Amino acid sequence: ENIAKRLSGLGLDFTFFDATDGKKLPASVLESVDYDFYPKHYLSPKPLTLGEIGCAISHIKVYEHMVENNIKSAIILEDDAIVSQHFKEIVEDTLNKINKNHELIFFDHGKVKSYFFKKRIVEGYRLAHYKAPSKNSRRCIIYATAYLITLSGAKKLLNYAYPIRLPADYLTGLIQKTRVDTYGIEPPCVFRGLNSDSEIDKIEHRYE
């Protein structure tokens, strides 16, 4: 409800996708998950939680929807995202200045290495082009709160999506694995809600 009011107030069209509740997934889906991959390769203290599995599937379903309907690009916002009042202008200016071959733009992200030159965009923000780490690096661009993905980017993520074995932000953030051409807005212009968990993870929080 809060994000709907915010986006409507900014004059942005949007569509809600039903989140996948990991606790309600059928046994056939849960049995197909590779629970060992994440802790083995990325030093997680525990295997994927049901909340993380549901979250990953929710994002993957959007990529599949894009491919099935030939949607050229989409901005994906998690339900607890807090969007800057300048978000619309930031997106428009970014798309006017970015390389046409871009595939992924993060509006929220953790630390990440980028190429030296950054383009200035509205309201003092900068557009950075991110460097892919070495192929076997564990480094990842964390957070899948808000990002733009193109059709070609969605196809690349789907090539690495199955079996389910990573949280949503590891699938988007492991650009050394997916080879997605990735950019980001610096500093972030969308933030994670601090007082409420995402609808798909109310009971089982990732870091608890």
What does each model-identified segment do?
Residues 1-77, 81-208:
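An acidic/histidine-cluster motif and surrounding catalytic segment
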